[in-house]
Amino acid sequence: MRKKQKSAVENETVYLHTRGVIKDNAVMALLGDKLFRQRVEKKRKGKGSYQRKAKHPGKIFEKPDYKFF
């Protein structure tokens, strides 16, 4: 009896690149893709973390007795 071999391709997710047809060098083509572009991370703590805008704009919680028509 012959054992069935599981292929590794079935479990892997396939990335749909935006480079069209890759002809020569797949690694260099994927490095130029939008997935590997440089991103600026926002500071969460420290000097550059101050945000001028409110976290939840437009959500003002008032007491219901102020709303008389």
UniProtKB/Swiss-Prot annotation:
Family: Belongs to the alternative ribosome-rescue factor A family.
Pfam families: ArfA
Protein name (record): Alternative ribosome-rescue factor A
Keyword terms of this UniProt record: RNA-binding, rRNA-binding, Translation regulation
One GO term of the biological process aspect: regulation of translation
Gene Ontology MF: a single term: rRNA binding
Family annotation (InterPro entries): ArfA (IPR005589)
Described function: Rescues ribosomes stalled at the 3' end of non-stop mRNAs. Recruits release factor 2 (RF2) to the stalled ribosome, helping position it correctly in the ribosomal A site so its GGQ motif can hydrolyze the peptidyl-tRNA bond.
UniProt key word Metal-binding: no
Subunit structure: Interacts with the 70S ribosome and release factor 2.
